[in-house]
């Protein structure tokens, strides 16, 4: 079991999203120290999707309780999906698959 969160976020302005992304890039390793992977994808000028992967449910729950509200003030609207990652392919070198 690999607990995974997928969060879609919309922002009032491009600047608000840029502020969020700057803060997330700088602070997310300390806000989510138990995460195995943190990924943020810009989908429009004012929205993005984040993916976070944890080693177990306890780590995911702890991260949620530790960070709720710390970055939320920058987000206009969001929705969260939680589940278990069932397929993972990581390519570290072109042509090589490392799972």
Explain the meaning of each model-derived region.
Residues 1-69, 73-99:
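Short S/T/G/P-rich N-terminal loop/turn motif that feeds into the first structured element of a domain
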């Amino acid at each position: 079991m690999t607990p995974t969160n997928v969060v879609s976020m919309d922002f009032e302005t491009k600047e608000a999203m840029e502020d969020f992304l700057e803060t997330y890039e700088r602070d997310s390793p300390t806000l989510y120290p138990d995460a195995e992977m943190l990924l943020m994808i810009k989908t429009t000028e004012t929205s993005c999707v984040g993916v976070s992967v944890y080693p177990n449910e306890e780590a995911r729950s702890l991260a949620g309780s530790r960070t709720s509200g710390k970055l939320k003030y920058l987000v206009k609207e969001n929705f969260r999906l939680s589940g278990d990652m069932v397929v993972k392919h990581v390519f570290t070198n072109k042509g090589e698959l490392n799972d």
